């Protein structure tokens, strides 16, 4: 493996490739390897474009807000400053916080306002993220003025996110901190950034239901209730049945216990806490560097081809758009040898961003205390920049945090969607289906009809009289449908619309600000 990495990213190989590329360019010959990328990163890279929702907020792709109940909060500027910065910060629970700051305020000033608003004690794991003019994500530097870092604005839009994923969630002392970690991981899984095997996704979803809804009561709760939640991008009916079955096994867990179990399960995911960055090798093909608590992973497409442990990386430099790593490895005789690896990035700014992220990860997870000396430069962070890690390390956050006797916070409810059975019944009626297609909201629900009975268009108010109509489904699945062996499920007296009104009432009650809802045949077409 090490030979392959030296052959691909070695300094001499990069020099030979550069000379060959220059010769081909002078001769007017192109190389397809210099063109578009081959393959993609194993996960969403940090330089990728975040999907933006109206208002500047970033939500999971194809989804929307994960929770409901987030309201708009305004924090006025302190003092008598006339010139102010207007910043909008989107929290993990969907709340939008607008903050007025002095003109020359630094990133630390804004971060302090946010954590004070949240009443957050374990602040070292979190940060504020923003998009630059090239749609590349960056972390707000606490030591620099906001205006010098953010060129898009005012108003300056940022997102409060988990920056360092704890390698051991049991070290998180505050229940509120663990709750924020769960929200971040739910965002990562729902957006597709964090890949999750089927069985693990089922367990995590069941723990979410246990934390939010409590005990699974069979007369009241059904797999149809599970379909009102979104846990993964491609959620199926069979998966919802498995989630419901697993949910029943977690009886007795409190919300705090369920969230801790969620984190202890999620920490074993292969891409948990991996900060991905796209780079190029000497062949011009795309690779991905993943920053982790243990070291730097190297991916070719979805395949992991190497790992550099932090103790083995002795130097890391950057110059313009080239990043250089010096790694110490043992040869066949047990002697240490230095190997130099060179990576290329699209621009000097992107290269510096990767270098800064690597320095911060190394300092946070590997050091006990950050270096406070400004004159002496360590071998690891040498050349090219005056940047120094100024925060606290994970060791300091774990051993030096003060504990509060009591702390209270509100868990926001998840956004609810029309249940699968209701969506299926409505979509099966050709009259109502045509009405839905004419709406301005093209995505009333994310489910496709599971059966298509022969209903004449002249029957505008067709609705089934029994839930057993699903037995006529032509969709064959390996797992039985949850309607087959549930004879105790009864249709409500008010029909299926009554359940949908309940979903709407739940979302309406959870909304904190103004909203607009459009009805057609008692069906909410705008959530």
Curated annotation (Swiss-Prot):
Transmembrane segments annotated in the record for this chain: none
Keyword Cytoplasm: yes
Keyword annotations of the record: Cell junction, Cytoplasm, Phosphoprotein, Tight junction
Cellular localization per UniProt: Cytoplasm; Cell junction, Tight junction
Biased composition, class Basic residues, residue ranges: 413-424
SUPFAM superfamilies on file: PH domain-like, Second domain of FERM, Ubiquitin-like
Stretches for region Disordered: 23-47, 400-425, 455-493
InterPro entries hit by this protein: Band_41_domain, EHM2_FERM_F1, Ez/rad/moesin-like, FA, FERM/acyl-CoA-bd_prot_sf, FERM_2, FERM_central, FERM_CS
GO biological process per UniProt: actomyosin structure organization; positive regulation of cell adhesion; positive regulation of gene expression; positive regulation of keratinocyte migration; wound healing
Function in brief: Up-regulates the activity of the Rho guanine nucleotide exchange factor ARHGEF18. Involved in the regulation of the circumferential actomyosin belt in epithelial cells. Promotes cellular adhesion, migration and motility in vitro and may play a role in wound healing. May have a role in mediating cytoskeletal changes associated with steroid-induced cell differentiation.
Protein name: Band 4.1-like protein 4B
Taxonomy of the source species: Eukaryota, Metazoa, Chordata, Craniata, Vertebrata
